[in-house]
Amino acid sequence: MEKDVVSLEDALEHGLTKEEFQKIQEILGRIPNSTELGIFSAMWSEHCSYKNSILKLKTLPTTSDKLLAKAGEENAGAMDIGDGLAVVFKIESHNHPTAVEPYQGAATGVGGIMRDIFTMGARPIVSLNSLRFGNPDEPKNKYLLSRAVKGIGDYGNSLGIAVSGGELFIDECFSKNPLVNAMTVGVVRHDQMASATTGGQVGNSVYIVGATTGRDGIHGASFASKDLSKESESKRSAVQVGDPFMEKLLMEASLEAIQKGLLVGIQDMGAAGISCATSEMSAKGKTGMKIDLDLVPFRETGMNAYEAMLSESQERMLVVPKKGKESELVSIFEKWNLNAVKIGEVTADGMIEIYMGGKLKAKIPAESLVLGGGAPRYERETKRPSYLDAVKTWKPDEIPDVTKGANSKEILLKILSSWNVCSRKPITEQYDSEVGLVKLIGPGLDGGLSAIPGTNKALATATDCNSRYTYLDPYKGAEFAVCEAARNVYVTGATPYGVTNNLNFANPYIPENYYIFSECIRGMGDACRFLGLPVTGGNVSFYNESPEGPIFPTPTIGMVGILENKEKLIFNFPKEIGVELAVLGNFRPSLGGSEYLKKIHGQINGSIPELDIKEELELCKLILSLNESRILKSAKDLSLGGIAVALSKTVLFSGLGIESDLTSLRRNRLDLTLFGESSTAVLVGFDSLSKEDIRKQTEAYGLKFYPIGKTNSSGILEIKDAEIKISFQELSGPYEKGLEAVFAL
């Protein structure tokens, strides 16, 4: 055994606590050497162990008769969608790497989540991304956003995976700490699903396949488990470097090997690289592994065991083939011009043994390293932040209603030009949404809808979270995020199926931060339970703060849904003149936390929109029932920017005109009526002959029917109550130009 014994000081420098260092010594029965310390520091980092979140995550609902892989069991969640098929999906973050190297940070985030999907045997169909950045008027923020989007586009386009949607949210709190959350969804036959395990097959060979191993990404897991600071800029070596063309080859070779039944198990080498893949596969299979690092294909000379075990070089997998299938495995990877090299074997003693230069460099029980095994778990102290009470004292009468008279039109145009409302075309045009010929409803709308090849089914996808809402009310804001994601799925005609989450929060050791995290988990869990949606997995990203302060809490919800008959899709916007428009649900507008309040009055304050989870479930049932009768011409979630923005987008996306009267929605303030944001509300279009039928069905579900207007051929939006009469061209200018300058060459 290598004898370079380490000290407590070394352990502290690696991000471990005094107590954790003591626990490691108890596990090993001795003081660890440097390689072992590096392995423990990576595997027990927040990024890999979820040590400060796992106890809270276990309170989320994770059961469903459709689940094929529960949260934490595999690389991603999997759910049965009938006909022998499963949908496999997950969302993950690459926040800190993007902050210091936006192109590679964002690109490798896409690559990592793709591998999580095809490692399970599923072919990726679509991807989404949820982005949070600071004000792009500032040069640094503009650089970060534009480079991150290019990284996402270049990597995804090279792989040939369509982008079905996503979101962008801009606020000053993300200036030093942007968020990049990447989601991928794939489909696989039940009998072709793969697992990240040794399968208990003692004596089987262990292969490393794919790219060579270099020094890029060393300490990546630890880097993601610390606050960003001025020194973070120097940590570029902790950012991985991706090669999408290599990933494409790796995907095809891996899927071929899985489909031919050659493998016992396969695991992506993401965070903590070989350390993570060997320990997780071994622990799941209740075995150990003996690894010879001299056999690993290196791209750099002189790498030692510490570096080899912690390298996060991209596009690599660890594979355990079935006995007798080794040569066939190698042939497949050689056909795709990829490495497939035996580096060890599965052992019976449960130990991870690492050799290099003929010497034993590390010997650690696999179970002691992994989440759910020996990795530490903590419940941190909580304290309710005082600001949560302060913001609720705000009342709308503290601001003037600036929409009176002819100002309504001017205010509407300002909101349409805001970063959080304006057109996403400068972003979505960098992504290939047509590849694979699966697009039915593409990016830029409420939810994406994609055909599932070889079936009549369609896959609905959405990501959602209003970070201002979760800042103002963590519990209700998280509930709102789940409900809005579900709404954006069912307005396509699809039934919401399951949830993956990306939990982006600040330092968990600060009691106020941990309180906010805990409340968001509670709100998310309650909403998912009531809506009958299992949480299939996801990612926790703590330490999202800089010396200037923490980000807004952002529990991003990734939602998938299934439409059994893709011919029954619902478009976001009507396509004909003479279509009646109405809001269904319970219109309860609020200016608290609204885009109007921030853009026009420069405030983030107040109570967020009231939400009744029972009504949300009934609205979902209503929309799906109406769609079964094929009487809806369109359906659009009513939320950010309020009814005025929803009507404006209807004109912009349909090219039609609208004559509207908002009497049925009228509140005591015009700005509240026009720009107040509401939960439990969907703007629908329908034939006039169906009006009374829809009204009766809506009331039968205990909801309200608010008639507001009709489409025409004028290309003009007219809102009589607000003295708004504005043409398509007038709307289009500010809406289309909002982000153009950010991405101008």
Curated annotation (Swiss-Prot):
Mg(2+) 1 binds at E92, N539. Its EC number is 6.3.5.3. Pathway: Purine metabolism; IMP biosynthesis via de novo pathway; 5-amino-1-(5-phospho-D-ribosyl)imidazole from N(2)-formyl-N(1)-(5-phospho-D-ribosyl)glycinamide: step 1/2. ATP binds at Y50, K90, N501, G538. GO terms for biological process: 'de novo' IMP biosynthetic process. The active site is at H47, H94 (proton acceptor). It catalyses: N(2)-formyl-N(1)-(5-phospho-beta-D-ribosyl)glycinamide + L-glutamine + ATP + H2O = 2-formamido-N(1)-(5-O-phospho-beta-D-ribosyl)acetamidine + L-glutamate + ADP + phosphate + H(+). Keywords: ATP-binding, Cytoplasm, Ligase, Magnesium, Metal-binding, Nucleotide-binding, Purine biosynthesis. The keyword Nucleotide-binding applies. It is found in: Cytoplasm. GO terms for molecular function: ATP binding; magnesium ion binding; phosphoribosylformylglycinamidine synthase activity. Substrate binds at S93, H94, N95, H96, R115, Q240, E312, S313, Q314, S541. It holds the Pfam family FGAR-AT_linker. The keyword Magnesium applies. One of its GO terms (cellular component) is cytoplasm. SUPFAM superfamilies: PurM C-terminal domain-like (SSF56042), PurM N-terminal domain-like (SSF55326). InterPro entries: PRibForGlyAmidine_synth_PurL, PurL_linker, PurM-like_C_dom, PurM-like_C_sf, PurM-like_N, PurM-like_N_sf. Mg(2+) 2 binds at D116, D268. Gene3D superfamilies: PurM-like C-terminal domain, PurM-like, N-terminal domain. Belongs to the FGAMS family. Monomer. Part of the FGAM synthase complex composed of 1 PurL, 1 PurQ and 2 PurS subunits. HAMAP family: PurL_2 (MF_00420). Part of the phosphoribosylformylglycinamidine synthase complex involved in the purines biosynthetic pathway. Catalyzes the ATP-dependent conversion of formylglycinamide ribonucleotide (FGAR) and glutamine to yield formylglycinamidine ribonucleotide (FGAM) and glutamate. The FGAM synthase complex is composed of three subunits. PurQ produces an ammonia molecule by converting glutamine to glutamate. PurL transfers the ammonia molecule to FGAR to form FGAM in an ATP-dependent manner. This is Phosphoribosylformylglycinamidine synthase subunit PurL.
